[in-house]
Amino acid sequence: YPHCAWDFLLYVARNIASSFATIHEHGHVVGDVNQNSFMVGRDSKVVLIDSDSFQINANGTLHLCEVGVSHFTPPELQTLSSFVGFERTENHDNFGLALLIFHVLFGGRHPYSGVPLISDAGNALETDIA
């Protein structure tokens, strides 16, 4: 949305955060947080379109999310070779949510994609996040 007004972008960010809160209130986790999980309408309404990888708590039976996009994965999970058998938390989602909001407000940029001021940074987003 390069031509959208700031207030529109703030409403979109708020609506994405609200969708995460609703999912969390029901005991579930988004898990595979990424920029392709949502569609945004002209009225700033947000629609979830990628829910097949949610971590679902169905009356005490936990159905895990076994996939994820590394650019939206929190630092403490960057070293995992696989998400198979790993239980995610709301806090893991919140890291991805913060990145999504940053993307919305700053033209699709990732907060770890800036120009590094030290020589060993900037080779890969995953290592910069970790």
Predicted regions and their residues:
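Conserved C-lobe activation region of Hanks-type protein kinase-like domains
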Residues: 88-92, 101-130
